[in-house]
Structures are given as structure tokens and as C-alpha cells.
Amino acid sequence: MIIASAGHVDHGKTLLVKALTGVDTDALPEEKARGLTIELGFAYHDLGDGSATGFIDVPGHERFIRTMVAGVSGIDVVMFVIAADDGPMPQTAEHLAILELLGVSRGVVALSKIDRVSEARLAEVSATIRTLLAPTALRACSILPVSALQGIGIEALRGELLALQRTLPPRASHGNFRLAVDRSFLLKGAGRVVTGTVFSGQLGVGDAVWHVPEGGELRVRGMHVHNQEATHASAGQRCALNVSGVALRDVEIHRGDWMVAAAAASAARRIDVEVRVLADEPSALANRTPVHVHIGAADVTGRLVTLDGQAIAPGERVLAQLMLDRPLHTLRGDRLVLRDQSARRTVGGGVVIDPAPDMRGRTRDERRAYLAAMALPDAHVSLPTALIALPGGLDLEVFARSWNLNGDERAALLKEPTLKLCASPVLGITVARWQILEDAMLAALSAAHAAHPERLGLGERELEKALRARLLRGVFDAVLDALVSAGRVVRDGAVLRLPQHSARRSPADDALWKRVCPLLERDELKAPVVHDLASALNLNHTLLEAFLIRVAKQGLVVKVSAKRYFLPPAMTRFEQLVRALTVDGNKFTAADFRDRAGVGRNAVIEILEYFDRIGLTHRSGDLRALLDTKRRA
């Protein structure tokens, strides 16, 4: 169990932790000199059941709220300290609001400094506290009078904490390992050590772990759990990891970073959330309000953008997107706290719904439907609804990572009976949607054949456009490949047609094709420009160009520019060359392609610009990258 203190500055939190554990958690000289907690303090103690309980002592001053939030994220129980002489103070209310936003529902109120007040004052403050707690999840917690200086009530407080520990449900061990880093330091003779609270999953010595958002893969050399050397750590424990790896050479590890399993390694600058503005906020939060976002131990600035563009009234709960100034690791269900631009006031909080929103090609209605699916309580309940919400296809890898599903949990998810798998990376649609797309493709080809019997068929881009549906490319490819494999669609070079269809060329075009084709086949990678081809055939340039446009629609040639046409096998070879040049994510220049293809510079530029247009490649400066790993030229 992990217990955190909370409460206003100078109400005796550190002294109570010391009375319970024997440990003075104020370790900094400045803290001792000023009598003020500045940093998180840690202690570990057996409350009486033979197990180590972790205590996190947080600062109470308003200037250190960001540190307080880092300390109470991921805890099991709060020890809420309120001084009997002062009663509830500003940070009492703010700490209580933060605990409510973070979903902390178990705790005890330690009514401290009772040696300074009368019985009447004690009763008055207790009643005030009960009223303060009434609208919160901590409404039923005990209020125990204590004095750390005189030792009054300490054993009763210890007993209450032990009772809470005994009734605490075990932390679920499912999901991937995630540790929110709240400290990072170098230890002589050991190297880099990071500490934090384990939010989910398990980790062992020797395992790989990923530093996000900025780092890479590291190896766990050793660990301590609740201040004791250990070989494994799991959810709900305080953990120190001694890590090593090449990635440490390039980046520092800071508070707010995460140590996670590879399957959970992700970060984004946009996060879809459900947010609630505190009811006592003096005014509504405008759309695009600058905020500080606290998740785990992180504090990141950004803007709060509502889905409907409207302001959020005090007490209102809405869907919104956080547009962050730097990438942040989150997963669905992570709780967050929002503070104002100056970081002086807590204004609200909420929960992450979609940690990796990709709005490309999604309508507003699809987006809302998908968020509604992601807000459901379980991944297996969410998936069928999410598939319906996104008829263009769902990235199942992203979905599983968002829900923090480990390997076994992902495998179980893919057994959903309404799911039809499409591609790798794994995409999915519903079985019913798959059938609709098959029928739509066949109908589009049939309509094209009826409208243009002289054409061989449609190119992939034409077919995709004819469907009038926003589809992930992998979904389109999977459905089409299935139709081709089943013999229901024929792929003729770059053209798609139904098996029973053949182009009806005129006798004149047939005769001309017999003259043109041998010249294009002579050296198929070095097709002549239209002007030279017309001269070689002693044909009118305009008439030949019109002919080539017709046979391009029939799939006999591919038009890469206004003046150059290639046979489909040549374009296939050029595409294979592009893929060879971009193995393992490499990029290439026009000169690289020219040297491998053995064609002239003008032809190279025309070919590569054609590949850019159809979405096979993307140019940035002098370099090109493979953009669509499945698209065919």
C-alpha cells in the first residue's frame, strides 16, 4: 500500500509521518532550516501486518502544488492532515479537489495539533471538516484527533491505516509495466537510478524497459521495492530501478517521464479527454484556454480545446482535446489535473479517453462516436462499438496500446466475433462492413464497365474514389486483395476488372497498338517521350497522344507525365527499386534512383514525381521516403 499525506502548509504532515514511521522525510538542508517541506519525502514502515507500507510526504505550500500532484498520483490511501487550531485552509480545499480529480477514495483525516485547542474547538472543526468532505469520495472517512508532539492518537491513526490496508482490494496485475518517474539521480558505483510509483503491470531484473517520451530502450540492472532489494516489481508499489543502456548517453531522465514496457511506449502532443471544471471556479473556461496539465508526475503546458468550440461552465463535464507544448505519455483512463496558466490555481481535471487521436479522414460525428466507445468501461465492450464508429477501419495496435493491453490480452481481443482483420499493422473492421465493401467494389467495377466498355477497367485510385468512403489504405488493400485472390476481380497490370470483362478497342486502335507496343518493349525502362515516339512511327503527335491516353485508361500503359508513358511491368520494376532504396526506413535522392535504374535525369524526375502524386513516396527537400508501404504503382 502507498499512503500520501495531504493538507495545508504547516499543519504537521511531516511530523505525523515521522511519528508513524520514525523517519524524518525532510531531507534537504533548506527544508530543515525553514521547517518547510519543498520536495517529496519518502518513508517505509510495517504498520503491523508484516508488510512494508510506503509513505509519501508532500509539500503543502501553494508554490509546490505541482510537486504535491506528482506525489499523490497513483496512491492507494490519503492521510489528510488538518490542524485543529487553523481548521480548513486554502490548500486544504485545493488538495481535496486534487484528490477528488485523481479518484482517491480511501483515506483518513488526521485532525492534528489537538493539544492546542479546547474540546469545543475540536468539535467545531470536526463538523466543518465533515461538511467539507460531504460532496467528495472521502465523505465516509474517519476523522481522528492526534498530536504528533505528545503522541496522542498515533496508535489509533496507525490502526486506521492498517484497517484500510487490510480492506484494500489487490491491484490488478494486468496490463503493461508503467512507472511514473518522480526522482532521477546518479548513484556512485551503480549509475542511473529512477524512482516512482508503479501504475500497472510487472517488471523483473534483467527486463527491458523504455524511457518515454524522449529516450529509448534500457535494461534493468537492479531494483528496490519499498526500500528493499527485490527481483520483481508490480502495480501499486514504490520502486527504484537501476537502469543502463546506450539511450542514457543522449538524454536525461526527469521527473514526469515514464519507464514503460515496449508495448506501452508512446507519447503524443494531442490527447482527447473528458474534463470537468471545478464548481467553485469564478467563471467559465474559454475554448483554447492555456493550462498546466498534470498527469503522473508530469507538468506540461498546453491549451484546452473543446470539441464544440464552446466555453466550459463551472461544474460542467465535456469532451475536449489537450494540445500540448511537448509530447506526453498517457493511456486511456489516466487521470489528470488542470491548473491555470500561471500555475496558481487548480481549475479542473479529468480522464484520458484517447491518448493517440488521429483525426485524419474522420468526421466530427465519427470522432464523437469513437470517443463514446473509448469511454466504455472495458476494452472488450469498447471494441465492437469502436469498429462501428470508424467504418473506414480501426488500427487495432493503437487501440490495444491505448487500453494498455499486454500480449495475452491483445490476443484475446482479436477473437472478437464481429471483427474482421485486414492488414499488418493490424487493422480491423466489422464483418458486416467487409461484406459491404466487397459488394461496393464489385458494383463500382461493373458500373465502370457498363459506362466505358472500351476501357479495360479502373486503376486502384479510381476504384477507391468510386467507393466514396473514407478507408484506411490497409483496409482497402485487404478487401481488394481478397477479391483478387478469390478470382472475383482480375488485376491486369495497373488496372482492375471483373473476370468476364475485356476492353473493346477499335480495329484502328488494335492496329496502332501493335506498332507502339514493340517500341515501348524494346527497352522498357527507357520509354521515349511522345514526340520521339511519334517521329519513330511517322505519326501525328496529337493523334498519338490521344491514343496513348485511351490505352492508359485501358491499363496497357501508365502515364507518368504529359510526355512519357511506360508499360506496367516497367513501373513495377521502378516501384521495386524504390522499395529496395527505402528498406528499414532509409531515404533516397533522385541521383540514387537514377544510378540504380540506369535512366536519364528527366525520366527520373518524371517517374519520382508520379510516385509522389499517387502517394507511394513523399519528397522533403532532396530526399524521398516510402510513404505507403502497400500502394502499388
What are these regions (language model features)?
Residues D10, L16, G35, D57, ...:
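Residue-level signature of catalytic and energy-coupling elements of molecular machines
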Residues R116-L122, T131, V246-K559, P568-H618, ...:
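C-terminal effector modules of nucleic-acid-centric enzymes and ribosome-associated factors
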Residues I114, T131-E281:
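Conserved catalytic-core segments of large NTP-driven translation/proteostasis enzymes
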Residues H61-E62, A84-M89, V104, K113-S118, ...:
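Conserved nucleotide-binding/hydrolysis micro-motifs of P-loop NTPases
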